[in-house]
Amino acid sequence: MTEFLTAAFYKFVELPDFAQLKAPLLTCCEANDVKGTILLATEGINSTIAGPAVGVHAVLAYLRRDPRLADLQHKEAWSAKAPFYRMKVRLKREIVTMGVPGIDPNLVVGTYVKPQDWNALIGDPDVVVIDTRNDYEVGIGTFAGAVNPDIQSFAMLPQWLAQAPALHPATGKKPKVAMFCTGGIRCEKSTALLRAQGFDEVFHLEGGILKYLETIPPEQSLWQGQCFVFDERVSVGHGLIPGQHDLCRACRQPLDDADLASPLFEAGVSCPKCHAITRDIQKDGARERQRQWELAKARQQVHIGASPEPKAMPATAGR
């Protein structure tokens, strides 16, 4: 059985020529049968790619030939199914969109905490633990005792941080803060923001939830549930074993068994989370895309229009 290697990586580094990097990088990926998304901006690179191991490693080697990316770190995972069906290299203002000018993780960032030391940190009652991910991600799993900002995008986090009572007690004393996200990139910016706002004791989970699940055995873990990932696996658990969630191809939210059993679920068209907010014309269009995808699947072809990729990947490697 063919297996696909997924590699996730990011690096904050000055890339003033980022637009010129796009075409040769796309050519390299296509030549090596690698699919996924690479985001490029003046502040760095952020990506999740997948394909045959030799192809993925060839792309990583190509990137590391640039002296600015020579120390690029990546995470690996295996999948029996193709996580992505297209290769996209996109030029962006930010490699993870927060929308706050002047925040540079290369200048100031929170203190990295290794997975082995994370339990002790978040077990401290004086530490405010914040899950920086979107609400649909938090909904299927998080750390015990973590605060959920209940946001729909990472760009909403700065406003929440400015108003969160736990961060602005009546005493005026700024608390210790521990932040986490899927792979680490969102915390690079969120901890940098808090440091810029005068919070001195700010920490974040090195390597994110994925590194924690890979490193910490279940019997020692404070993680509850599954971790949402932005590829065909949808969710993973301890040991990065693929979880039991499916993905609504209409709204791109994770679905559990109860969602799939709901009369509001129609494959590729709607689910209990989006049925009421989509119009009939949207459902009709989705129904036709699903039909085309099923025809292509029956012919053992790839139908790009109904591929399993998320429409947007707000934080590819940093999820």
From Swiss-Prot:
Domain Rhodanese: 123-221
Primary enzyme class: oxidoreductase
GO molecular function: oxidoreductase activity, acting on paired donors, with incorporation or reduction of molecular oxygen
Catalytic residue positions: C181
SMART domains per record: RHOD
SUPFAM superfamilies for the chain: Rhodanese/Cell cycle control phosphatase
Disordered: annotated span: 298-319
Alphabetized Pfam families for the sequence: Rhodanese, UPF0176_N
Similarity field: Belongs to the TrhO family.
Record HAMAP family: TrhO
Role summary: Catalyzes oxygen-dependent 5-hydroxyuridine (ho5U) modification at position 34 in tRNAs.
Protein's recorded name: tRNA uridine(34) hydroxylase
Origin species: Albidiferax ferrireducens (strain ATCC BAA-621 / DSM 15236 / T118)
Gene it is expressed from: trhO
